Swiss-Prot record:
One of its GO terms (biological process) is cell division. The lineage of its organism: Bacteria, Pseudomonadati, Pseudomonadota, Gammaproteobacteria, Enterobacterales. The gene is mukB. It is found in: Cytoplasm, Nucleoid. Residues 326-418, 444-480, 509-603, 835-923, 977-1115, 1209-1266 form a coiled coil. ATP binds at G34, G35, N36, G37, A38, G39, K40, S41. Transmembrane segments: none annotated. This is Chromosome partition protein MukB. It holds the Pfam family MukB.
Length: 1486
C-alpha cells in the first residue's frame, strides 16, 4: 500500500506578527483558533502563497476596502509582510519518504503601487533534524536574529552535503517539480491550470458552493482526454501536413515548370545572344576581309576614272569654245529670219490697210450727204409735232375742266400777249417794223425763198471745197511719199527729188533680183566649207582618241586593221560569255546545294543533340538505327523487371501499413466489431484492461490468455445472454469473461509457468499449453514496440519502393525519349554531317568566285578594247567619204567673195523692200508735185460765211412761222362771244380735239420714224469715221515700223534666212549634243569619282572600324569563352542549330526570352538585378554571368537527399520523376490517415461511457456525506441532446454527409463543425471559426452536462445552490465537491507521474464556526476516509479532541505586537504539549 504524501509544517518568516514561526500540521485536521485579528487568515495566506506564488491570482479579500468597486492594489499580500526579506515555506514528505521543502521568498517593493516580489525555490535532501527556521535565520544573540537573504540561503545549503537547492524563474517549473514529487495533485502546465487550482483553494478557504467551480465542473472533474485529442490532432496535423506536402508538391511542380521555363528561357536568352555574337564575330571577320578586297578594287577603279575624267574634261573645253561661236552665228541668223518675217508681215498689212482706206473714204462722203438731208427733215417733223401736241393739250385741258373753259379769257389773254411777243421778235429778227399778223404769211414766203437761196449757195461752195480738197490731198500724198523715201525737204524741191528717186529705184531693183542666185551659191559653198571643217574636227578627234596623228593616206589601211581587230575581239567576248555562264551555273548549283544543306543542318543537329542526350543518359554509343531499336527492346525488358519488383515491394509495404493500422487501434482491438460489441454489452475489452502491461510482461499475458486475449470483460454474463441471440456481426470466436473492469486481475485461470511457456488449466479435463510469442502484441507497450519495428521495416520498404519507382519512371522516361527520338530524328540522325559538306562546298564556292572575278577582269579589258575599236571604225566611216574636202584649200576664199557680192545685193533688196511700195505709189502721181494748190484756204473761208448766212435765214423764217401759227391768238381780245355760246363752244372743242389728236398722231409717227432713221445714219457715219481714223493711224504706224526694221522683204528672203538658221541650228545642236554627252559623261564620271571617293573613305572607315571591332570583340569574346569554359556551360550555350538563324531572328528570340525572364525572376531580387545588368549589349559576358547565376540558383534549390546531381536540367528531370512518385504516395497516405466518422463517434461514446462510470464511482464515495438536512450529495452527468444527435448521425447516417468528410478543402474538425451546424441550424455559432467549433466537438467533455445534486430532507434530490441551502449545508456540500475534484485530479494525473507516488491532499476552511458539531464530525470522518489534510480557522476551539489545535492570541508589548501561539495535539492521558511560542514582532491586525 502506497502511503500518501503529507504536509509536515508551515513556516512564516518576517510576516506581520510572525517573525519565525513554524506550524506543525496534523495528518488530518489542523485548527487555528483565535479572536479577530489573531493572525489566522495571515497564516493560511502564507500557506496559499507558498502553494501558488502567482501574483495575478493571489487576492485575499478580507483586506479589501469596504464598498470599493475594485480590489486593493496589493490584493491583501503587501500589508501582511514586514519590511525586508520574508519567507513562506512548506515542509513536506512524499510517498517515497523524501523530505521536500518548497517555499517563496517575498519582499516588498518600494513605491505607491504596493507591489511584492516573489521568488519560488525548493530544497531537497534536507535532513529530518534540520528545522526550516534554522535554515533562513541567523541567531545574533539571545534575543536577536537575522533573516538570511536568498543568495545567502543558497550558499548555506550548497555547503551542506546532499542538499539540493533550486530557484525557479517561472511558476510552471516550480509547480512541475511539486507535481513530480507528489506535493500537488495536478500538473499545472498553464496559467489556466493555475487559475483552476487557485479557484479550488479559494473556494475551500472561504467555504460554500463556488459558482466558479460548479459552472465549470466539466473542466474540474472530467479529465482532458489528451490522448484522443492528440490522436485527432496528430491525425489532422498529419492530414494537414500531407495536404500541405501535396500542395507543396504542386507548388514544386509549378516551381519545376518555373525552373524548366527559367532554364529554357535563360538558355534561349543567353544562347541566342551567344550564338549571335559568334555569328557576328564570323560575319565581322568576313566583312573585314570583304572590305579590304573592296578597298583595293575601289582604289583601282578611282584611278581609272580619274584618267577618264581628264580626257573628257579636255574635250568638253574644246566643245564649249566652239559652242560660243555657233550660238552667236545662230542667234544672228535667227534674228535676221525674224526681221525678214516681220517685214513681210508688215508689208502685207500696209497694202491691206491702204485698200481699206480708199473704200472707207468713198463710203464716208456718201454718208455725210445722207445725214445732212435727214437732219433737215427731222427739224421740220419736230416743229410740226410740237404744234400738234400743244393744240391737243390745250383742247384737252379745256374739255377736262369746263369751268376752266369759262375762265379761258384770262388764258387767252396770256396767249394773246405771247402772240404779240412773237410778233415783236419776228420784227426784230427780220428787220420789219411794220410787220403785222396779217402780213406775216406773205413775209414768210419771202424769207423762205431767201433761206432756200442761201442753202443752194452753201451747197455750191461745199462742192467746190470738196474738189479743192481732193487736189490738195494728192499733192500732200505725193509730198509725203517723197519725204518718207528721201527724208525732210522743201515743198518746191519735191519734184526734182521725186524724179531722182524713181531713177535710183530702177537700179536697186535690178541688183535685188541677183540676191537669190548669189545666196544659193553661197549656201552651197558654205555647206562644203562646214563639211570640210567637220571632217577636220573628226580627224583631229580620231587622232586624239587613238593617241597618234595619222595622214589622210593612212586612214583606209587603218580602217581595215580595226575591222579585223573587232572580229577577233567579238569571238573572244562570245567565248568568255559562255565560260562565264558555265561558271555562274556551277556557282548557282553550289549555292542551291548549300541552302539545302543549311536547311537540313538544324534538323540534323537537333537529332545529334537528342542522340547525344540519349547516349549520356544510358551510357551507350549508337552508330546506327538498329542499335537504337535493340537498346529500346532492352529498355522494355528492364522496365518490366523493375515494375515487377516495385509491385512486390509495394504489396509488402501495404501489408505492413495494414498491420500498423490494425495495431494502432485504440484499446488494442484488432477488430472494430469488438469495440461495438463491448459498448453494446456494457463491457470493456480485455486488451484495454491490460493496456498498461509492460513490454517484459506482454509475452506472459499473451500466452496466459491465448485466443481469449481479445475477450470482452462484462460485469454480469447473465445480462449478456439476451444479446447473444441472433448475433451475427461478430468474430468467429467471441470470448466473454465476467469480472469488474475497474478491479480485474488474472485469477480467473489456474496457471503453471514453464520456460518461455505457460500451462493454463481451463478445466479439470482441459489444459492449454501456450508458448511465449516471439512478437507479443498484448498491451500498449508491446504494440508500440511492434509498431516501431514495423515502422522501421516500412521506412526500408518505402525507401526501396521509392528507389524502384524512381528507376521505373526513369526507365519509362528514357523509353519515351527513345520513342520521341525514333519518331522525330531517327530518319536523319545517322546521315552524313551536312556541316562538313557545307565547308567543302564553301571552299569550292570561294574558288569559283575568285575565277569569276579574274574572268570578269579579263572580259572587261577585252570589252574596253572592243568598244575602242568600234568607236575608231565608226569615226573612220564618217571621215573617209570627206577625204576630197580635206584636200580642197581654196574653198574658204571663194566663200568670202560670194559673201561680199551677196551683201551688196541684199542691201539693194532691202532698199527695194523698204521703199518699193512708196515708189510705186509715187510714180503715177509724181506730176502733181509740179504745182502747189494755194487757193484752198480762201475757199474754206467763203464756205464758212455761206454757212452763217444760211443759218440766219433759217432763224428769220422760223420766227415768221411762229407768228403765223399764233395768228388765232390775236383774235382773243374779245371773249364775250365765247361766254354766250356755251354749248356750241363745247361741241366745237370736241371736234377740234379729235382733229388735233389725229394730226398729233401722224406727226409723232413721222417724227419717230425719221428719228430712228437719222439715228441709224449717224451711227453709220460715226462707225465709218472711227474705222477710217483707226486704219489711217494703223497704216501710219505700220509704215513707220517697216522703216524702223530696215530689211527689204522680197519673196526669197525668208527661205534663205530659214535655211541659214537651220544649218547653224543643226551645227549647234550637234555641238550641244556632244557637249551634253560629255557633260553627262563628265558628271557621271565625277559622280562616280565622288561615289568612289566616298565609298573609298567609307570602306577605309568601315574597314578600320571593323578591324578595330574585330580586335576589340576578340578580347571580349575570349573573356566570354573563358567564362563559359570555366563554368562548364559551353555545351548548353553553343547550340549549333542557332548558327543558321539570322541575327534578327536570334535577337527576336533573345528579346522574347528576356520578356519572359523579367516575369519569371520578378520575385527574385538577385536574379532580377543580374538580369537587369545583363541587358547591356556592350557587355555580353554579363549574360553568361546571368546564365551561371540561374544555374547556381537552381543548384541551390536541388535537394541533394532526393536528387543527386548538380545539373539543374537533369535535376528537373529527376524532380519530375520524384514528384510524381511522392504525389502518388502521399495521396495513398492521405486515404490511410483519414479516420472515419463512425470511428470518431465510437471513440467519443466510449470515452463518455468511461467517464460516466468514473463519476458513478465518485458518487459512491459521497453517498454517506451529510450536513444538516443534506443526507447525500451526488454528481449528475447527462449527454446533451444536440451532441447525442451528432453522435447518432456520425455512426448511423454518415453516408448522407460524405460531401463534408470527403472534401479535400476541409479538415475533419471543420467537417464536423459544418455537420453540427447542418444538424442544429437554430444555434448561433457567433464569431467562432469552424476549426474552433470542430476542435470543441472532438472534446468529449463538451458533450456532457454536469450538475451537483443534494438529497435534502423531504425535498428529495435538488440542484445544489447556495440559495437553497443553509450556510453550514453549503459549506459542507462545497467541501464535498472540492474533495471530489481533488480525487478526480489524482485519478487523471496517475498516468502522468510515477506509480509509487500518491500526492498530498490538503484543503482549507476559514470561519468554520458556521458548521455544527455533526457537520464538523462529518468533515473529520471525510478527511480520515480520504486521507486528506484540512486546515480550519475558527474563533473558538472546534473538536479539540481530534487533530492539532493552535490557539493564536495577538498581544502588545512595549509598543510592539506579536502573536502568541499555543498548540494542542488532541486529547490524551498526558498533558497537552505546549508548542514553542512565537517571536515578537511589530504587527498590525491580520
Amino acid at each position: 500500500m502506497i502511503e500518501r504524501g503529507k504536509f509536515r509544517s508551515l513556516t512564516l518568516i518576517n510576516w506581520n506578527g510572525f517573525f519565525a514561526r513554524t506550524f506543525d500540521l496534523d495528518e488530518l485536521v489542523t485548527t487555528l483558533s483565535g479572536g479577530n485579528g489573531a493572525g489566522k487568515s495571515t497564516t493560511m495566506a502564507a500557506f496559499v502563497t507558498a502553494l501558488i506564488p502567482d501574483l495575478t491570482l493571489l487576492h485575499f479579500r478580507n483586506t479589501t476596502e469596504a464598498g470599493a468597486t475594485s480590489g486593493s492594489r496589493d490584493k491583501g499580500l503587501h500589508g501582511k509582510l514586514k519590511a525586508g526579506v520574508c519567507y513562506s515555506m512548506l515542509d513536506t514528505i512524499n510517498s517515497r519518504h523524501q523530505r521536500v521543502v518548497v517555499g517563496v521568498r517575498l519582499q516588498q517593493v518600494a513605491g505607491r503601487d504596493r507591489k511584492v516580489d516573489i521568488k519560488p525555490f525548493a530544497i531537497q535532501g534536507l535532513p529530518m533534524s534540520v528545522q526550516p527556521t534554522q535554515l533562513v535565520t541567523e541567531t545574533l544573540n539571545e534575543r536577536q536574529a537575522r533573516v538570511l537573504p536568498l543568495n545567502e540561503l543558497k550558499d548555506k545549503l550548497e555547503a551542506m552535503e546532499g542538499v539540493q537547492f533550486k530557484q525557479f524563474n517561472s511558476i510552471t517549473d516550480y509547480h512541475s517539480l511539486m507535481f513530480d514529487l507528489g506535493i500537488i495533485a495536478r500538473r499545472l502546465r498553464s496559467a489556466s491550470d493555475r487559475s483552476k487550482f487557485y479557484r479550488l483553494i479559494e473556494a475551500s478557504l472561504y467555504g460554500g458552493i463556488s459558482s466558479a467551480i460548479t459552472r465549470s465542473l466539466r473542466d474540474y472533474l472530467l479529465p482532458e482526454n489528451s490522448g484522443v485529442r492528440k490522436a485527432f490532432q496528430d491525425m489532422e496535423a498529419a492530414l494537414r501536413e500531407n495536404r500541405m506536402t501535396l500542395e507543396a508538391i504542386r507548388v514544386t511542380q509549378s516551381d519545376r515548370d518555373l525552373f524548366k521555363h527559367l532554364i529554357s528561357e535563360a538558355t534561349n536568352y543567353v544562347a541566342a545572344d551567344y550564338m549571335r555574337h559568334a555569328n557576328e564575330r564570323r560575319v565581322h571577320l568576313d566583312k573585314a576581309l570583304e572590305f579590304r578586297r573592296e578597298l583595293h578594287t575601289s582604289r583601282q577603279q578611282l584611278a581609272a576614272e580619274q584618267y577618264k575624267h581628264v580626257d573628257m574634261a579636255r574635250e568638253l573645253a574644246e566643245h564649249n569654245g566652239a559652242e560660243g561661236d555657233l550660238e552667236a552665228d545662230y542667234q544672228a541668223a535667227s534674228d535676221h529670219l525674224n526681221l525678214v518675217q516681220t517685214a513681210l508681215r508688215q508689208q502685207e498689212k500696209i497694202e491691206r490697210y491702204e485698200a481699206d482706206l480708199d473704200e472707207l473714204q468713198i463710203r464716208l462722203e456718201e454718208q455725210n450727204e445722207v445725214v445732212a438731208e435727214a437732219i433737215e427733215r427731222q427739224e421740220e417733223n419736230e416743229a410740226r409735232a410740237e404744234a400738234a401736241e400743244l393744240e391737243v393739250d390745250e383742247l384737252k385741258s379745256q374739255l377736262a375742266d369746263y369751268q376752266q373753259a369759262l375762265d379761258v379769257q384770262q388764258t387767252r389773254a396770256i396767249q394773246y400777249n405771247q402772240a404779240i411777243a412773237a410778233l415783236n421778235r419776228a420784227k426784230e429778227l427780220c428787220h420789219l417794223p411794220d410787220l403785222t399778223a396779217d402780213s406775216a404769211a406773205e413775209w414768210l414766203e419771202t424769207f423762205q425763198a431767201k433761206e432756200l437761196e442761201a442753202t443752194e449757195k452753201m451747197l455750191s461752195l461745199e462742192q467746190k471745197m470738196s474738189m479743192a480738197q481732193t487736189a490738195h490731198s494728192q499733192f500732200e500724198q505725193a509730198y509725203q511719199l517723197v519725204v518718207a523715201i528721201n527724208g525732210p525737204l522743201a515743198r518746191n524741191e519735191a519734184w526734182d527729188v521725186a524724179r531722182e528717186l524713181l531713177r535710183e529705184g530702177v537700179d536697186q531693183r535690178h541688183l535685188a533680183e541677183q540676191v537669190q542666185p548669189l545666196r544659193m551659191r553661197l549656201s552651197e559653198l558654205e555647206q562644203r566649207l562646214r563639211e570640210q571643217q567637220e571632217a577636220e574636227r573628226l580627224l583631229a578627234d580620231f587622232c586624239k582618241r587613238q593617241g597618234k596623228n595619222f595622214d589622210i593616206d593612212e586612214l583606209e589601211a587603218l580602217h581595215q586593221e580595226l575591222e579585223a581587230r573587232i572580229a577577233s575581239l567579238s569571238d573572244s567576248v562570245s567565248n568568255a560569255r559562255e565560260e562565264r555562264m558555265a561558271l555562274r551555273q556551277e556557282q548557282e548549283q553550289l549555292q542551291s546545294r548549300i541552302q539545302s544543306l543549311m536547311q537540313r543542318a538544324p534538323v540534323w543537329l537537333a537529332a545529334q543533340n537528342s542522340l547525344n542526350q540519349l547516349s549520356e543518359q544510358c551510357g551507350e554509343e549508337f552508330t546506327s538505327s538498329q542499335d537504337v531499336t535493340e537498346f529500346l527492346q532492352q529498355l522494355l525488358e528492364r522496365e518490366r523487371e523493375a515494375i515487377v519488383e516495385r509491385d512486390e515491394v509495394g504489396a509488402r509495404k501495404n501489408a505492413v501499413d495494414e498491420e500498423i493500422e490494425r495495431l494502432s487501434q485504440p484499446g488494442g482491438s484488432e477488430d472494430q466489431r469488438l469495440n461495438a460489441l463491448a459498448e453494446r454489452f456494457g463491457g470493456v475489452l480485455l486488451s484495454e484492461i491490460y493496456d498498461d502491461v509492460s513490454l517484459e510482461d506482454a509475452p506472459y499475458f499473451s500466452a496466459l490468455y491465448g485466443p481469449s486475449r481479445h475477450a470482452i470483460v462484462v460485469p454480469d454474463l447473465s445480462q449478456v445472454t439476451e444479446h447473444l441471440e441472433g448475433l451475427t456481426d461478430c468474430p468467429e470466436d467471441l470470448y466473454l469473461i465476467e469480472g469488474d473492469p475497474q478491479s480485474f486481475d488474472d485469477s480467473v485461470f489456474s496457471v503453471d509457468e514453464l520456460e518461455k511457456a505457460v500451462v493454463v488449466k481451463i478445466a479439470d479435463r482441459q489444459w492449454r499449453y501456450s508458448r511465449f510469442p516471439e512478437v507479443p502484441l498484448f498491451g500498449r507497450a508491446a504494440r508500440e514496440s511492434r509498431i516501431e519495428s514495423l515502422h522501421a521495416e516500412r521506412e526500408v520498404l518505402s525507401e526501396r519502393f521509392a528507389t524502384l519507382s524512381f528507376d521505373v519512371q526513369k526507365i519509362q522516361r528514357l523509353h519515351q525519349a527513345f520513342s520521341r527520338f525514333i519518331g522525330s530524328h531517327l530518319a536523319v540522325a545517322f546521315e552524313s554531317d551536312p556541316e562538313a559538306e557545307i565547308r567543302q562546298l564553301n571552299s569550292r564556292r570561294v574558288e569559283l568566285e575568285r575565277a569569276l572575278s579574274n574572268h570578269e577582269n579579263d572580259n572587261q579589258q577585252q570589252r574596253i578594247q572592243f568598244e575602242q575599236a568600234k568607236e575608231g571604225v565608226t569615226a573612220l566611216n564618217r571621215i573617209l567619204p570627206r577625204l576630197n574636202l580635206l584636200a580642197d584649200d581654196s574653198l574658204a576664199d571663194r566663200v568670202d567673195e560670194i559673201r561680199e557680192r551677196l551683201d551688196e545685193a541684199q542691201e539693194a533688196a532691202r532698199f527695194v523692200q523698204q521703199f518699193g511700195n512708196q515708189l510705186a505709189k509715187l510714180e503715177p502721181i509724181v506730176s502733181v508735185l509740179q504745182s502747189d494748190p494755194e487757193q484752198f484756204e480762201q475757199l474754206k473761208e467763203d464756205y464758212a460765211y455761206s454757212q452763217q448766212m444760211q443759218r440766219d435765214a433759217r432763224q428769220q423764217a422760223f420766227a415768221l412761222t411762229e407768228v403765223v401759227q399764233r395768228r388765232a391768238h390775236f383774235s382773243y381780245s374779245d371773249s364775250a362771244e365765247m361766254l354766250s355760246g356755251n354749248s356750241d363752244l363745247n361741241e366745237k372743242l370736241r371736234e377740234r380735239l379729235e382733229q388735233a389728236e389725229a394730226e398729233r398722231t401722224r406727226a409723232r409717227e413721222a417724227l419717230r420714224g425719221h428719228a430712228a432713221q437719222l439715228n441709224q445714219y449717224n451711227q453709220v457715219l460715226a462707225s465709218l469715221k472711227s474705222s477710217y481714223d483707226t486704219k489711217k493711224e494703223l497704216l501710219n504706224d505700220l509704215q513707220r515700223e517697216l522703216q524702223d526694221i530696215g530689211v527689204r522683204a522680197d519673196s526669197g528672203a525668208e527661205e534663205r534666212a530659214r535655211i541659214r538658221r537651220d544649218e547653224l541650228h543643226a551645227q549647234l545642236s550637234n555641238n550641244r549634243s556632244r557637249r551634253n554627252q560629255l557633260e553627262k559623261a563628265l558628271t557621271f564620271c565625277e559622280a562616280e569619282m565622288d561615289n568612289l571617293t566616298r565609298k573609298l573613305r567609307k570602306l577605309e572607315r568601315d574597314y578600320f572600324e571593323m578591324r578595330e571591332q574585330v580586335v576589340t570583340a576578340k578580347a571580349g569574346w575570349c573573356a566570354v569563352m573563358r567564362m563559359v569554359k570555366d563554368n562548364g556551360v559551353e555545351r548548353r550555350l553553343h547550340r549549333r542549330e542557332l548558327a543558321y538563324l539570322s541575327a534578327d531572328d536570334l535577337r527576336s528570340m533573345s528579346d522574347k526570352a528576356l520578356g519572359a525572364l523579367r516575369l519569371a525572376v520578378a520575385d527574385n531580387e538577385h536574379l532580377r538585378d543580374v538580369l537587369r545588368m545583363s541587358e547591356d549589349p556592350k557587355r555580353p559576358e554579363r549574360k553568361i554571368q546571368f546564365f551561371v547565376a540561374v544555374y547556381q540558383h537552381l543548384r541551390e534549390r536541388i535537394r541533394q537527399d532526393i536528387i543527386r546531381t548538380d545539373d539543374p536540367v537533369e535535376a528537373i528531370e529527376q524532380m519530375e520523376i520524384e514528384l510524381s512518385r511522392l504525389t502518388e504516395e502521399l495521396t495513398s497516405r492521405e486515404q490511410k490517415l483519414a479516420i472515419s466518422s463512425r470511428s470518431v463517434a465510437n471513440i467519443i461514446r466510449k470515452t463518455i461511457q468511461r467517464e460516466q462510470n468514473r463519476i458513478r464511482m465518485l458518487n459512491q464515495g459521497l453517498q454517506n456525506v451529510s450536513f444538516g438536512q443534506v443526507n447525500s450529495v451526488r454528481l449528475n452527468v447527462n449527454v446533451r441532446e444536440t451532441h447525442a444527435m451528432l453522435l447518432d448521425v456520425l455512426s448511423e447516417q454518415h453516408e448522407q454527409h460524405q460531401d463534408l468528410f470527403n472534401s479535400n478543402r476541409l479538415t475533419f474538425s471543420e467537417a464536423l463543425a459544418k455537420l453540427y451546424q447542418r444538424l442544429n441550424p437554430q444555434i448561433d455559432m457567433g464569431q467562432r471559426t469552424p476549426q474552433t467549433i470542430g476542435e470543441e466537438l472532438l472534446d468529449y467533455r463538451n458533450y456532457l452536462e454536469m450538475e451537483v445534486e443534494v438529497n435534502r430532507g423531504s425535498d428529495g434530490w435538488l440542484r445544489a445552490e447556495s440559495g437553497a441551502l443553509s450556510t453550514g449545508e453549503a459549506i459542507g456540500t462545497g467541501m464535498s465537491i472540492l474533495v471530489m475534484v481533488v480525487q478526480s485530479w489524482e485519478d487523471e494525473s496517475r498516468r502522468l507521474r510515477g506509480k509509487d507516488i500518491s500526492p498530498c491532499r490538503l484543503l482549507f476552511l476559514d470561519e468554520a464556526a458556521r458548521l455544527d458539531a455533526r457537520s464538523i464530525a462529518t468533515l473529520f470522518e471525510l478527511c480520515e476516509r480520504l486521507q486528506m489534510q484540512l486546515i480550519i480557522a475558527a474563533p473558538e476551539n472546534i473538536s479539540p479532541e481530534k487533530g492539532t489545535t493552535y490557539k493564536l492570541v495577538r498581544k502588545v508589548f512595549q509598543n510592539t505586537e506579536h502573536v502568541h501561539v499555543v498548540g494542542l495535539r488532541g486529547f490524551a492521558p498526558q498533558l497537552p504539549e505546549t508548542l514553542p511560542g512565537s517571536d515578537e514582532a511589530p504587527s498590525q491586525a491580520s
